[in-house]
């Protein structure tokens, strides 16, 4: 990457309004001469996508099947997931797998179903929502952490042998730029009723996701499976409309489209660049730091990382 391009990218990255909004991909796609997603061939690829029925997930699903992939869409609603799968473009195919990522028994059943259907070479953790009220699953785990941290960890563990057969398989996590405001916490990862705030809980979950992505990369050889996380910038999706209506009203004209938000996700699935490293965090097809603030970086210690891994393993029931 040329020095002048790196300098220009840093100028774009510095103010959030240029980096996270639609201005970012408009400038960076020209700066780096992005390869068109239409040029990739995914025939023969088997991709598991959670949260593929709306927003960024749906935009990615449409790309995957149009490029020829065999897609397994994991969704909570059978009617909606099957309807979405039936409407996705060819030449690829899509099959619905029904599960709530926050229900660990359903995650285990979904993983078994995926294996029965032939397994996968790529697993995408995209499901996730920002909820205003605190809820817990049947195991007593706060719903955001259950569905966005523990459930994905469990599914990754169960599908790891299948993913490894691709040599390398790929695991990609859709995080959020909101995690930049949150430090790494384990004892307070699940917010209590008296302190609960949906946006803060979401940010803590996303911070944990990105940290777990890096930890997975240290535990699994990149010759077997590579791990990447990314954030989409600020995109105009049904989730943003429902959970952040004021933000959407103010930023509306500058928000990215779903296709722009999903671009790097699709690229990480399709391009060979994703197989050259593991454990990275991306925005607009470039690796990014996981901390922007010294206050959050201070919380990210080796001891706390080890505690996070053990904690998630315990909640997922995957401790050996």
Question: In which residue ranges do the predicted regions lie?
Answer:
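Rossmann-fold scaffold of SDR-type NAD(P)-dependent oxidoreductases
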Residues: 50, 120-128, 148, 172-176, ...
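Catalytic loop of short-chain dehydrogenase/reductase
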Residues: 128-138, 142, 164-224, 231-251
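Short alpha-helix in the Rossmann-fold core of NAD(P)-dependent oxidoreductases
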Residues: 134, 145-159, 172, 205-206, ...
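C-terminal helical subdomain
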Residues: 6-13, 21-26, 205, 251-293, ...
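Conserved glycine-rich cofactor-binding loop
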Residues: 46, 53-54
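The beta1-alpha1 cofactor-binding region of Rossmann-like NAD(H)/NADP(H)-dependent oxidoreductases
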Residues: 78, 96-112
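Non-catalytic terminal and boundary segments that flank Rossmann-like NAD(P)-dependent oxidoreductase
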Residues: 1-48, 183, 298-320
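Conserved glycine-rich Rossmann-like NAD(P)H-binding loop of the short-chain dehydrogenase/reductase
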Residues: 67-83
């Amino acid at each position: 990457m040329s020095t002048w391009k790196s300098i220009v990218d840093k100028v774009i990255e510095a103010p959030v309004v240029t980096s996270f909004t639609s201005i970012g991909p408009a400038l960076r796609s020209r700066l780096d001469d992005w390869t068109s997603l239409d040029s990739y061939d995914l025939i023969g690829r088997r991709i598991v996508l959670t949260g593929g029925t709306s927003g960024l997930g749906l935009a990615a699903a449409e790309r995957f099947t149009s490029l020829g992939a065999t897609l397994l869409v994991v969704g909570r609603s059978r009617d909606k997931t099957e309807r979405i799968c039936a409407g996705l473009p060819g030449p690829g195919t899509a099959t619905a797998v029904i599960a709530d990522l926050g229900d660990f028994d359903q995650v285990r059943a979904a993983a078994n179903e995926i294996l029965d259907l032939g397994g996968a070479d790529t697993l995408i953790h995209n499901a996730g929502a920002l909820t205003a009220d605190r809820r817990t699953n049947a195991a007593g785990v706060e719903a955001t952490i259950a569905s966005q941290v523990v459930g994905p960890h469990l599914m990754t563990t169960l599908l790891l042998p299948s993913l490894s057969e691709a040599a390398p398989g790929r695991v990609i996590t859709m995080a959020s730029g909101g995690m930049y405001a949150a430090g790494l916490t384990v004892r307070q990862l699940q917010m209590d009723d008296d302190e609960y705030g949906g946006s803060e809980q979401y940010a803590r979950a996303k911070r944990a996701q990105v940290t777990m992505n890096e930890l997975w990369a240290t535990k699994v050889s990149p010759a077997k499976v590579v791990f990447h996380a990314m954030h989409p910038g600020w995109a105009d999706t049904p989730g943003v409309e429902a959970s952040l209506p004021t933000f959407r009203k103010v930023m509306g004209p500058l928000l990215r489209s779903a296709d722009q938000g999903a671009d790097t996700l699709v690229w990480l699935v399709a391009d060979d660049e994703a197989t050259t490293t593991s454990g990275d965090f991306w925005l607009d097809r470039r690796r990014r730091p996981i901390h922007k603030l010294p206050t959050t970086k201070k919380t990210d210690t080796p001891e706390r990382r080890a505690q996070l891994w053990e904690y998630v393993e315990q909640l997922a029931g995957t401790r050996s």
